[in-house]
Structures are given as C-alpha cells and as structure tokens.
Amino acid sequence: MENLARFLSTTLKQLRQQRGWSLSRLAEATGVSKAMLGQIERNESSPTVATLWKIATGLNVPFSTFISPPQSATPSVYDPQQQAMVITSLFPYDPQLCFEHFSIQMASGAISESTPHEKGVIEHVVVIDGQLDLCVDGEWQTLNCGEGVRFAADVTHIYRNGGEQTVHFHSLIHYPRS
C-alpha cells in the first residue's frame, strides 16, 4: 500500500509538471484544494476515491493512471476515509481500446459519489455478488447479482451498498477516442 501511495504522489506531480501547471492551476482544473494537492504530492495525505476521480477528470487522464504501477499485477485503492471500498484494476487503461476495467468491493453501508467524467465516457456496471444501489443523474436503481447497466458517465453517479453484506461489482469505463 505504501508503494501505491508513493506511486500516486509521484504520478500526480509528474502530470502537473508535464503540463507546466502550478498547484493553483491544478486546483482550478480539479476542484481539489491546493493544500490537499500539495499534501498528496508530498505523500503526506491519501486521497479518497472521490478525490482521486476529481483529479483524474481534471487532468483528463484515466483513473487507473494513478493506481497501476507498471510492475504491479493487481493494484488496489483502499478508501481510507470510508474504510469500506476497495478498487482493483483488472485491466489498466488501454489507449488503443480506450477503456479500463475495475473490480470494486464495498462494505455494507458504504457510499461513493463519482463526479461527472468527461463528455462521451460510458460506464458499464455488473454486480458479481450482493446488491448495489446506483444513482445516475438523480435516478436510483437497484442491481442484484448478475445484473448490469450501461450509462453515460458524464453526469454525477453514486454507488451505495444498502445491503447487509459486501457488494462486489465490476466497472468497465470506455473513454471517447481523442
């Protein structure tokens, strides 16, 4: 987990510097405070999954950019604030196919709000085990084991486990071609 945190902080700093951006400019683009971004870059703070999505969206890079070190076969992100969500990259972003694929586990009672992705992003969610409540653009639906949905992910979407057991689901995210 420590290697992942170091990888995340290094990657964030490299992406910011490649663009020639200050922390203030990065804060404007992501909606994350300059102080928090600085703490993440210095590896003094671990971002929540929601914060990491904001950063990825603001930088216009796939989420897996931050959790897929080249030498790691199964990188995971654990949400330290919720202490209830684990995201594992099954297939990191593929620039030729323009998608990434995650396995996600959420403990009972966990909730995660995802900010809108860039225009044209499509997300597929399939429940592997348990029951998932999903809200897309204000409309809630419940998905049971074996059920799935595809939606435009350029709107706010919320994942919630209202059940008594951990829910396990896959998220396949398609990005528009550049």
UniProtKB/Swiss-Prot annotation:
The keyword Repressor applies. Residues 105-171 form the Cupin type-2 domain. GO terms for molecular function: DNA binding; DNA-binding transcription factor activity; sequence-specific DNA binding. Residues 23-42 bind DNA. Pfam families: Cupin_2 (PF07883), HTH_3 (PF01381). Regulates the expression of 12-16 transcription units involved in various steps of sulfur utilization. Represses expression of pfkB, fliZ, cysE, ydcO and its own expression. Activates expression of ypfN. Acts by binding to SutR boxes. This is HTH-type transcriptional regulator SutR.
